[in-house]
């Protein structure tokens, strides 16, 4: 929630001016420099801002509910992307491990176990194919998740320095790491996040050598550091994107006037939380495709019972409550 901008101007190696500008909707308690990386042309510094949670949550009601996310194993975009992984064929599993560890350590999410699924999905942020949407929605329902995280490896290829002996002595080959992260919202049935992550670093290993990606030798290399850094960025970006998203839940059962929703204690649901009913309807497009439409109602429900993975809600005003409530309707946290 904080944007920290630091500018330092140098002339002939002498610091001329130093300026720190912090933009945040919530008070910042302190700043801590987490890491620093120096290259020939720039210095990259990672700063952690400690924000007063009382103010942050007051401005972001969605943060009160821990979103259920389902990571799907990384896949290669195509055969060419896979062929470029010679020596590090296990990079997809290593990215799975790194991203999963970061997600598990994020209190904003309820992270489901990694799923290895061969999904026929598009890399485009505009996902309109009904078959793809149906696949992802079914997967989300099966594992009780609203958000599905998809990773696609576009390239991990090495660069060539040519056959010239002098060139080979002077230059070290480089290797790229380029992948996409997409987040699918199963309730709204659309991709809500699409971002590309890319880096290039020296590759000091032999061309045909198999590399143990969990060895200290790989981890300490510049390329290994960039892989680890990008995996950490994914977690930070997902928290920033999803934490304040409206907290939605599906109605999974009806009990008289009460409704049961598919989020519970594990998601941070507590008694007396209030939700607004959003009714779902199935519509048909001009080409015969079916899609869901949602219409917000005036009906308000209050949490009366909380279970590990579900909660029961009761109407606040029975006299003005919507009568035709159905399973698969949606409620949104007020």
Residue ranges and their predicted role:
Residues 2-51:
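Intrinsically disordered, low-complexity charged/polar segments
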Residues 171-172, 178, 185-230, 287-308:
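Short secondary-structure boundary motifs at beta->alpha junctions and helix caps
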Residues 266-334:
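C-terminal soluble interaction/assembly domains
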Residues 1-14, 82-152, 190-194, 270-273, ...:
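N-terminal segment of the mature soluble domain
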């Amino acid at each position: 929630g904080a944007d920290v901008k630091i500018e330092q101007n140098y002339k002939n190696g002498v610091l001329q001016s130093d300026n720190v500008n912090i933009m945040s909707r919530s008070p910042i308690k302190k700043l801590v420099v987490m890491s620093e990386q120096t290259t020939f042309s720039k210095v990259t510094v990672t700063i952690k801002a400690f924000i007063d949670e009382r103010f942050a949550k007051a401005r972001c009601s969605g943060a009160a509910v821990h979103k259920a996310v389902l990571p799907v194993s990384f896949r290669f975009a195509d055969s060419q992307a896979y062929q470029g992984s010679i020596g590090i064929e296990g990079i997809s599993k290593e990215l799975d491990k790194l991203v999963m560890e970061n997600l598990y350590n994020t209190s904003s999410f309820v992270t489901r176990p990694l799923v290895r699924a061969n999904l026929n999905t598009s890399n485009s942020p505009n996902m309109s194919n009904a078959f793809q949407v149906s696949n992802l929605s079914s997967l989300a329902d099966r594992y009780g998740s609203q958000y599905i995280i998809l990773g696609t490896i576009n390239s991990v290829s090495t660069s060539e320095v040519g056959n010239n002996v002098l060139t080979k002595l002077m230059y070290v080959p480089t290797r790229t790491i380029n992948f996409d992260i997409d987040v699918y919202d199963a309730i709204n049935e659309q991709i809500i996040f699409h971002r590309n992550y890319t880096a290039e670093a020296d590759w000091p290993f032999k061309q045909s050598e198999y590399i143990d990606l969990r060895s200290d030798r790989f981890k300490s290399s510049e390329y290994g550091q960039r892989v680890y850094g990008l995996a950490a960025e994914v977690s930070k970006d997902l928290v920033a994107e999803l934490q304040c998203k409206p907290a939605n839940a599906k109605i999974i059962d009806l009990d008289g006037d009460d409704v049961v929703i598919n989020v519970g204690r594990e998601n941070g649901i507590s008694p007396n939380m209030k939700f607004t009913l959003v009714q779902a309807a199935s519509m048909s497009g001009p080409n015969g495709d079916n899609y869901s439409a949602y219409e917000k109602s005036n009906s308000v429900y209050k949490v009366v019972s909380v279970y590990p993975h579900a909660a029961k809600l009761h109407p606040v005003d029975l006299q003005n409550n919507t009568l035709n409530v159905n399973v698969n309707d949606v409620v949104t946290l007020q």
